[in-house]
Each structure stands twice: as structure tokens, then as C-alpha cells.
């Protein structure tokens, strides 16, 4: 399944970069995340709950940030397993300043889901992936706005 999209965030690339890679901001932004903990450099363990149609699944997995080009791009690699299947994927996040105080984050990647979710919700998975990305960046926008506000108060 292809994963792609572009999302505007209200800050310069340096601020967006630091918030996107901040463990606390990630924990607050990942839809369905129940826990998100560092596991060494640029790696995290995550427990999350995902719903597709009427099926809900809990997954435990790992998130790795790789191929970092500071304030420009990075790759996010995700793996998870649960009682109802497994999920994996990777995506390249590219940051571009479109005007002062505004950064576009473009996401290009692929994901796979195996097990019950894949069998029951195959037709819906693309839509679900887009919805989850929209939720993630909506949550991340709030984290970026809080960071900008905190910096202005200093």
C-alpha cells in the first residue's frame, strides 16, 4: 500500500524538524499510541491500538528514524505485531520551506498489513492510512504551534 501526502506546518524547517523528531511530540501525535518510549539512539518502542472498520487491534512494535539529513529529510521505519496480524512500513519525510514561517512536509512511502486486518479491510486500508496521516499531522501541528509559542515567550 502506498503512503503519500503533503502537510503544511506553521513554522520554519528548523522548528518543524526538532518537533517532528521530539519523542514527546511524537508520542502525542501518533494516532492510537498508548506508549512510546526511547530504545536507544533514534529508535523507540510503541504500543498502539488501530481500528479498521469494526476490527480493533493492539500492536507492539518499533519505530526507527534513519537517513537523517538535518532540517531536510529523514526516513521513518515502523514494524509491529499483534494478535490480529502484523504491520510494517517506511516513509521518507522531506521538509521544504514554502514561505517564512511555513514548512511543507512531504511523505512518500509504503506499508503492509498482514493478518485479519488485511483480509477484512483490504479495500479500506488506503483510506485508513490517509486518515491516520491526517490525524498525525493535525496533532503535530498543535505540537509545532506550542513550540513556536514557547520560543516567542522566551
Residue ranges: model-predicted function:
Residues 1-51, 146, 153-154:
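Hydrophobic ligand-binding cavity/cleft-lining segments
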Residues 2-8, 43-45, 58-60, 73, ...:
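Intrinsic-disorder/low-complexity, polar/charged segments enriched in Ser/Thr/Lys/Arg/Asp/Glu/Gln
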Residues 5, 34, 61-67, 78, ...:
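Hydrophobic/aromatic beta-strand elements that line small-molecule binding cavities or substrate pockets
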Residues 12, 41, 70-71, 98-101:
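Short strand-connecting beta-turns/loops that link adjacent beta-strands
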Residues 16, 20, 26, 65, ...:
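Hydrophobic pocket/interface hotspot
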Residues 37-79, 135:
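Glycine-rich portal/gate segments that line the openings of hydrophobic small-molecule binding cavities
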Residues 79-127:
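Beta-strand/loop substructures that line and gate deep hydrophobic ligand-binding cavities in soluble
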Residues 116-154:
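A conserved amphipathic terminal alpha-helix motif
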